[in-house]
Structure formats: C-alpha cells, structure tokens
Amino acid sequence: MRIFLFSLFVLAAFSSYAQDVTPVTVPAKAVAQLEKIRKQTQVIREVGKKGSSLPAETRPILNKILVQSATDFLAITKRKAGPTKEAYYQSLDAMLARLHPLVPQLEDRQQVAEYYQDLLDIVGIDSSEGRLTTFVEGAAN
C-alpha cells in the first residue's frame, strides 16, 4: 500500500511539473520587435502624445506598467533555459492585475488589451487563453 501511494505521489508530482512547462518557439525577430515597442511606449510616456480618456496623472503610471511589461517579455525571451508560455502568462497576469484599477473605461481597456496581444504575437503566442477578454470585460462588472 505504501509503495502504491508513494508511486502515485511521484507520478502526480511529475505530471504537475510537465503541465507547468510549455516551451515557446520565439520568432527570430522577437527581441528587436520587443525593444522597438518598449522604446515607442517610453516615448509616448515622455511626450504624452497618445490621447486617452484617462486622467493626466494616471497616464504616466499606465505607461510605466506597459514599459515594464515589454521589459519582462524581453527578459523571458532572453532566458537561457528558454521561454515558456507560463512565464509569459504569469507576467501578463501580474501586469493586468496592476492595470485593472487604473483603467476603468472599456475603450481604454481595449487599447491595453491590443498592446498585450501585440506582445503575445511578437513572441509567437496566439492566445491569451481568455486573460485579455476577462480584463476588457472587467470594465462592465
């Protein structure tokens, strides 16, 4: 009985590990594209060119988080162990949680979601698995 329980525990541990690591094949130009989008976002923050319904004091905070997101995606992309979907999703979840209280309007949430979809597209991930939809629809709740 102990051997059965032990082997069940070991199999469960290995299966959970296997589910936690989904390697991503990142396109060759991803690093350059992420650096470009990060620089563009920094310029928008500094110059304040992009229109929005957000209060003026919120815009620099929002852009700082967007720049941090691009920086995080760059760091994940450059990992020696290789990037994983879960690492990108973890970064996405953390940043969306920070942005949630700052972006109450649906139109602004849609713009933010488009930015993150661009980041995901750059690194070769087709879907946010509902994360961006949940973020955008959170404005209605």
Where are these regions (language model features)?
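Short terminal alpha-helical segments
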Residues: 20-74, 140
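Amphipathic alpha-helical binding modules
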Residues: 21-33, 105-141
